[in-house]
Amino acid sequence: MSLTADPPACTVPAAGGSSTHKLVNGGAEKIIFKIKSSNNNEYRIAPVFGFVDPAGSKDVVITRTAGAPKEDKLVIHFAPAPADATDAQAAFAAVTPAGTVTIPMSATA
């Protein structure tokens, strides 16, 4: 089971902007994920919870509101998805994360 992010880093203007990243499942199992941010005041992530099908991908949009330039990060926790899961947020509470992917975020002036 593996999950990667493409592109692996995010650079957005400190004045605000957005970046789209693709989560790619390189394995044969459906994956469930949850995304945590080191800065919830200036970043919005969509979706926060979700599924990625085997050998599939899922787009994640990172949106930055205006603020001081600084370095932050996203950490994507992932695990094999329960077979009967349809609500990622509810199902994630019942799994133990099997790995993480970190996306460094840089807001530039």
Swiss-Prot record:
Signal peptide (UniProt feature, chain positions): none
Superkingdom, natural source: Eukaryota
Entry's transmembrane regions: none
Gene3D superfamilies: Immunoglobulins (2.60.40.10)
PROSITE patterns: MSP
Chain ranges of the MSP domain: 2-109
Name of this protein: Sperm-specific class P protein 9/11
Source organism of this protein record: Caenorhabditis elegans
Chain's gene name: ssp-9
